[in-house]
């Protein structure tokens, strides 16, 4: 059995999804996701010019050897561009493997560890009352867990994942108005003084059973993060996400020394070598890698296995910067992983997205139920794909009140 060709598609409804289709001489094909948010042409070019020509003639069943070929053969490897490209190919090879075996991927991993995977939605508000309404909306839909983000009084602009006006939704589609990003203003002092009280108000309103998550998006210094994590201990957060810049992993040791608030990190990590020390030293409670950015299913399974040895649970990234193909890979990993924690879930099921990526994965009552179809359980409609062209886009950048560049 040989790989005969592979195609790369860029485009989609509201996002420039990068989709890889690997074809074989048996007629079986596999699909993978290489979407790198607002940098989509980079993995697409890497795939088209370098990786796809090398795949031709290889045996798609040898997914481990191909992964090693892609990774070790690159020499200048790791990083989001390379790992997204490797990840898409690996995902497609697993899809082929499942179709050949006539099994859903979770069966190839070792079978189900659970019947459904708990997900969390994104509740946002321009102010606290607006946020409360958003949380109530998710609770009414059956969600057991909600990430909460809120506008900060006195902050000059809306911040990460917060709408500009009350009652508005925070759109996660790309801003296609041009390459130059918009600027948001951040003030850590205002955040640290106000947010702990807001989180406690949410806990008091919705009671002890709702899982509350909160994302700092890498914006605090180590001392500030330790202070904040300690201050919110009475809230009993399910997790505090990305409290410090991802590059400064020693910062999490300081946070850990001062607080028992669970810590989640990893959506920007591209390999096991960026998180192995955090896991082995048990400085985190949840690992947030994605099958796209972290080199595909093969590599993410290694991370999950290592995490399980150290009581670290999964909480895979699930923003709309991943296509339904990546989310399907996560659904299968979540069904299998004995150390599953929770799955980020933003509804992608618009009519346009469903037409482009037909699937029978289900979400109900705050749980994702994995498809039993062979492989990933998601298809790709090339005729629908022809409707979409690449559009340059951007997401905001962040500056402090004095103009200093800061982490988005």
Curated annotation (Swiss-Prot):
SMART domains: MR_MLE. Pfam families: MR_MLE_C, MR_MLE_N. D-arabinonate binds at residues 217, 267, 288, 317, 344. GO terms for biological process: amino acid catabolic process; carbohydrate catabolic process. Signal peptide: none annotated. Keywords: Magnesium, Metal-binding. Has no detectable activity with D-mannonate and with a panel of 70 other acid sugars (in vitro), in spite of the conservation of the residues that are expected to be important for catalytic activity and cofactor binding. May have evolved a divergent function. This is D-galactonate dehydratase family member OG2516_05608. It comes from Oceanicola granulosus (strain ATCC BAA-861 / DSM 15982 / KCTC 12143 / HTCC2516).
């Amino acid at each position: 059995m040989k790989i005969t060709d592979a195609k790369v598609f860029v485009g989609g409804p509201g996002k420039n999804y990068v989709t890889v289709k690997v074809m074989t001489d048996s007629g079986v094909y596999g699909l993978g996701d290489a979407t790198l948010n607002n940098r989509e042409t980079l993995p697409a070019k890497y795939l088209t010019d370098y990786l796809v020509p090398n795949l031709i003639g290889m045996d798609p069943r040898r997914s481990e050897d191909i992964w090693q070929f892609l990774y070790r053969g690159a020499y200048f490897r790791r990083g989001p561009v390379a790992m997204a490209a490797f990840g898409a190919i690996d995902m497609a090879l697993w899809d082929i493997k499942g179709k050949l075996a006539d099994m859903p991927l979770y069966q190839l991993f070792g079978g189900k560890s659970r019947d459904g995977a708990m997900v969390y939605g994104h509740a946002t508000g321009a102010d606290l009352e607006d946020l409360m309404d958003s949380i109530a909306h998710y609770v009414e839909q059956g969600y057991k867990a909600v990430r909460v983000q809120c506008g900060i009084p006195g902050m000059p602009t809306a911040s990460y994942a917060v709408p500009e006006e009350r009652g508005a939704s925070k759109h996660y589609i790309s801003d296609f108005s041009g390459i130059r990003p918009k600027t948001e203003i951040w003030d850590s002092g205002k955040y640290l003084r106000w947010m702990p009280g807001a989180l406690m108000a949410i806990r008091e309103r919705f009671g002890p059973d709702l899982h509350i998550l909160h994302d700092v998006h890498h914006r605090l210094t180590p001392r500030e993060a330790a202070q904040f994590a300690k201050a919110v201990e009475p809230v009993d957060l399910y997790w505090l996400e990305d409290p410090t810049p991802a590059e400064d992993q020693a910062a999490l040791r300081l946070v850990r020394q001062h607080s028992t608030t669970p810590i989640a990190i990893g959506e920007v990590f591209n390999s096991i070598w960026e998180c192995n020390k955090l896991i082995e030293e048990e400085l985190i409670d949840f690992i947030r890698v994605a099958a796209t950015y972290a080199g595909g299913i093969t590599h993410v399974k290694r991370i999950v296995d290592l995490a399980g040895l150290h009581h670290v649970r999964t909480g895979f990234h699930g923003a709309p910067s991943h296509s339904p193909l990546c989310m399907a890979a996560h659904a299968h990993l979540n069904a299998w992983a004995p150390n599953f924690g929770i799955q980020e879930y933003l509804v992608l099921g618009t009519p346009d997205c469903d037409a482009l990526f037909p699937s029978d994965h289900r979400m109900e009552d705050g749980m994702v139920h994995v498809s039993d179809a062979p492989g990933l359980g998601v298809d790709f409609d090339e005729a629908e794909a022809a409707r979409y062209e690449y559009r340059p886009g951007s997401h905001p950048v962040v500056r402090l009140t004095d103009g200093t560049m800061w982490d988005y």
